[in-house]
Amino acid sequence: FFSSDTGNTWTSANNGLTSSTIYSFLINNSDIFVGTSADGLFLSTNNGASWNAQNTGLASSFVHSLAVSGSNLFAGSNYKGMYRSTNNGNSWSQINNGLTSTFINSILATTNELFVGTVNGLFMSADTGNTWVQSDSGITNKFIIAVAKLGSHLIAASYLNEVYLSVNNGSTWNLLNNGLPTGGSSSLVISGSNIFLGTYQNGVFLSADTGNTWNAVNNG
């Protein structure tokens, strides 16, 4: 769906899409990419007016996460691992060397590294995805649903409402759960110095102190 009035009204923008379940979005300059659950990746070059499949080289039809770093695009799939494109999605190459889990939930592209959250741990690459090393020391629940950058720190969220902070680029992690209920996490977003955690049963929680304390923000 597309809105041109800050979300007040929405219109369908599905021309060319053959799958209606969208799991990921990526905007790269004027191009929009969406990852679907059944038919892979689609690209729009006209603000969503039409879409074309961009699946050459992709062995998975379920694209769960997307990221961009410089001239490289990255796609995380379910059970087929990571893919990289160097030509704006025209073709893709699998880049799983070192990944022991190939169900990719999330991708974070920083200036020099890539981080991916999987159903069995967090992995880091310092060479645009050519090789991966596990980077989740201190994380007990390794079903990582999201990883994000907060200033010079990294924040990771696991499925069971566990949020972790790393101050050394992912080498070690500390649990920051004060105020969070038990249950499942669905999403993590950073806005300035604020961290927002979406949950399955308990709404949205906010931390304004680098994850040290959390409060529900569900008014409305």
Predicted regions and their residues:
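A structural motif specific to WD40 beta-propellers
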Residues: 10-13, 51-54, 91-95, 132-135, ...
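Conserved Ser/Thr-centered positions that define the repeating blades of beta-propeller domains
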Residues: 3-4, 44-45, 85-86, 125-126, ...
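Loop/turn residues immediately N-terminal
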Residues: 39-41, 80-82, 120-123, 160-163, ...
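Conserved positions at the start
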Residues: 22, 29, 63, 104, ...
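Thr-biased low-complexity repeat/linker tracts and other Thr-enriched repetitive architectures
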Residues: 1-11, 15, 128, 201-202, ...
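Entry beta-strands of beta-propeller and related beta-repeat scaffolds
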Residues: 31-34, 72-75, 113-116, 153-156, ...
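Short loop/turn motifs that recur once per blade in beta-propeller domains
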Residues: 14-20, 55-61, 74, 96-102, ...
